[in-house]
Amino acid sequence: INIKGEKIMPMQMGFRWYGEGNDKISLSDIKQIPGVTSIVWALHNKMPGEVWEVEEIAEVQKQLEPYGFNMDVVESVNVHDDIKVGLPTRDGYIANYIQTIKNLSKFGVKVICYNFMPVFDWTRTDLFHPVGDGSTALYYEASRIHDDPKEMADYILNNLNGLTFPGWEPERMAKLDELFELYRPVTKEKLWENLKYFLEAIMPTCKECDIKMAIHMDDPPWDIFGLPRLLVDAESVDYFLKLVDDPYNCLTLCSGSLNANPKNNVAEIVAKHCDRIAFAHIRNVKHFENGDFSEASHRDCDGDTGILDILKAYHDCGYEGYIRPDHGRHLWTEGPGNVRPGYGLYDRALGIMYMLGVWDMLDKLEGK
């Protein structure tokens, strides 16, 4: 029962999986993590703008069914650059996106995570930074972000161990100079306009198919390399939800993305917009005085994000959406050459157990 006295479905714990042949973690491994009911998936061979065909989606369903996982959440159906820039060709790519939504609905998908970040997806300067306990983690060094963006892109691509990463497609990164030129005239105001155009075009289909579009926060939450960022703080989240005020226009609220800026109070945003959060990412970051930050374990005291306050805010509002541990350290045998940066097995599994332990205790304190 939520605070309105309504009967709801319980929060569903998810685990991001990159697919057979593209993820060193198996579905059998994930099945052994208590509490996981949902595989957060995507067709990682698809380029932005392409239609996800029914036959391709059915193949993923076939892989998940023996393990009893649902495929309710897709992360991500990436948005083509022509839509973000607002080129005349965008309507064709929007039509493809609409067809993909319709095809996904045939398989019970409920949430599509996406982002509207120009050129780059998440951005880090070190993928295997020593934490101090023998593990490594994703790290952002503020002084290096002003260097050549191509150098940073090459570093990331060269350390993906041949694995895919949405937003870092080699085909796109090979045209980095062209992409920067494409986005050069796009102001923050224009990017907001183009996002609104995209959402207004797809909302009728989302309602028809009962699929929520859940935008991911910009990571990190500030402009980089002269490129504008939109979802960066509480004010911009408010603006986004009013921009297209529709129950199918929702958030993927990523605690670590927002709290890379220590001024952002994620728990307050959760409390204010719980009904518009379709998907929750729980990530912990440690801040440094020079503007650097490191990703940390999910344990509250290991970072500065306020994980306990955030989980309590979700619990207090009767959160009924999907949640997953977002990023983790690389532990024990994991390291360069054998793990997708930020997406090892062990620390994310530990994070799930921490999150569920907190949730169980909150339930117990409420007498559930």
Language model segments and positions:
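A short, local hydrophobic-aromatic micro-motif
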Residues: 37, 72, 277-278
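Generic secondary-structure boundary/loop-capping signal
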Residues: 40, 73-74, 228
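Ligand-binding pocket scaffold of soluble enzyme catalytic domains
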Residues: 9-49, 56, 63-68
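Structural motif corresponding to the early beta-alpha repeats
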Residues: 45-193, 207-208, 257, 315
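Histidine-acidic metal/acid-base catalytic patches
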Residues: 5-14, 19-21, 28, 62-65, ...
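Residue-level "edge-of-site" marker
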Residues: 19, 43-44, 77, 117, ...
